[in-house]
């Protein structure tokens, strides 16, 4: 999936910003979180996050659920490089494995109703 953030900001600018963030906040991870294009789930109000390195994927999902005001019966799935990361994995390990060459970790999210309602 193409990242709108990548389309809107040139590589050099993204790389410089990620480096600045990592220098200033060594214990934080710069994350870009965007909705999967064809998903009917709510669009998030901000794309850029500075996530504590010791946060788990599950805890990050909770943050996203809150930001999009997702009701408890709705499912949300997050993807890193189009793969579901393990819920218990630390964001720091996901970052080390999947960070983009610009220094950001790109996460996409999608949803479906777990009870099959339209």
From Swiss-Prot:
Biological function: Ubiquitin-like modifier involved in cytoplasm to vacuole transport (Cvt) vesicles and autophagosome formation. With ATG4, mediates the delivery of the vesicles and autophagosomes to the vacuole via the microtubule cytoskeleton. Required for selective autophagic degradation of the nucleus (nucleophagy) as well as for mitophagy which contributes to regulate mitochondrial quantity and quality by eliminating the mitochondria to a basal level to fulfill cellular energy requirements and preventing excess ROS production.
Residues that make up the propeptide removed upon maturation: 117-118
Source organism of this protein record: Gibberella zeae (strain ATCC MYA-4620 / CBS 123657 / FGSC 9075 / NRRL 31084 / PH-1)
Subunit field text: Conjugation to phosphatidylethanolamine (PE) leads to homodimerization. Interacts with ATG1, ATG3, ATG4, ATG7 and ATG12.
Name the record gives this protein: Autophagy-related protein 8
Site (Cleavage): 116-117
InterPro entries named among the record's database cross-references: Atg8-like, Ubiquitin-like_domsf
Post-translational modification comment from the UniProt entry: The C-terminal Glu-117 and Ala-118 residues of ATG8 are removed by ATG4 to expose Gly-116 at the C-terminus. This Gly-116 forms then a thioester bond with the 'Cys-550' of ATG7 (E1-like activating enzyme) before being transferred to the 'Cys-244' of ATG3 (the specific E2 conjugating enzyme), in order to be finally amidated with phosphatidylethanolamine. This lipid modification anchors ATG8 to membranes and can be reversed by ATG4, releasing soluble ATG8.
Lipidation (Phosphatidylethanolamine amidated glycine): 116
Location(s) in or outside the cell: Cytoplasmic vesicle, Cvt vesicle membrane; Cytoplasmic vesicle, Autophagosome membrane; Vacuole membrane
Membrane topology: Lipid-anchor
Keyword NADP tagged: no
